[in-house]
UniProtKB/Swiss-Prot annotation:
InterPro entries: Actinoporin_PFT, Cytolysin/lectin
Functional note: Pore-forming protein that forms pores of around 1 nm and causes cardiac stimulation and cytolysis.
Quaternary structure note: Octamer or nonamer in membranes. Monomer in the soluble state.
Highest taxon in the source lineage: Eukaryota
Name of the featured protein: Tereporin-Ca1
Family per record: Belongs to the actinoporin family. Conoidea subfamily.
Tissue specificity: Expressed by the venom duct.
Keyword Transcription: no
Protein's cellular compartments: Secreted; Nematocyst; Target cell membrane
Motif Cell attachment site, crucial for protein stability, chain ranges: 138-140
UniProt xrefs under SUPFAM superfamilies: Cytolysin/lectin
Keywords: Cytolysis, Ion transport, Membrane, Nematocyst, Secreted, Target cell membrane, Target membrane, Toxin, Transmembrane, Transport
Region (N-terminal region): 2-21
Species this protein is from: Terebra anilis
Length: 190
């Protein structure tokens, strides 16, 4: 896996360094044979994208970053998704990085739409589902999520074709690292 254009000459920590109290820098490694195209980011509550997500070619890693809104005591949360071009699905990542750790924790979720589902719903639909909804959901989007406060154990979503493994730090300038890859013995998608 080699760095793509968004990480050329910088690091994930470098993407997160915006001078804001709450930021989230996200790196995705694509171990599949499918390009991850048409990134769609939805940042909640007037948060800002400081580096835009980009397509992720097979064998590459790319990064982007978001921050809390200016002049507010809020965190940053949202979703980003990419189409697995050729697999006719979307890979979806949800994050929540709060302003106050006295009452809230960092959360991250990863998942995939069912085959044939590539459309992105409007607004916060995926965020609300992945943050508040049951993880045994049998709808168009299937996912796992985890809390990153006392532990930073990975969150793993797996189906018959793909496995997504993600970690998130438990600090205000959060770093998220995610790998999407074929499941074991699924060499056709490698």
């Amino acid at each position: 896996i080699t760095a793509g254009s968004s990480l050329a000459g910088t690091t994930l920590s470098g993407l997160a360094a915006s001078g804001y109290r709450v930021t989230c820098a996200i790196q995705v490694e694509n171990w599949t044979r499918y390009p991850l195209l048409y990134p769609t980011v939805r940042v909640n509550y007037n948060g800002a994208v400081t580096v835009n997500p980009s397509p992720i070619l097979p064998g590459k890693k790319e990064g982007f970053s978001v921050r809390k809104p200016s002049g507010t005591a809020t965190g940053v949360s949202g979703t980003v998704s990419w189409e697995l071009s050729g697999a006719h699905r979307r890979f979806v990542l949800m994050w929540s990085a709060p302003f106050n750790f006295d009452h809230y924790s960092n959360w991250m979720g990863v998942g995939l739409t069912q085959p044939g589902v590539t459309r992105v719903p409007p607004g916060k639909a995926w965020f609300d589902l992945m943050y508040y909804g049951p993880t045994d959901c049998k709808g168009e989007l299937r996912y796992e999520r985890g809390e990153f406060y006392y532990t930073i154990d990975p969150v793993i979503y797996r189906d018959e074709n793909f496995e997504i493994v993600g970690t998130m730090t438990n600090v205000h300038n959060a770093l998220i690292k995610v790998v999407i890859r074929p499941t074991r013995k699924n060499w056709k998608d490698l």
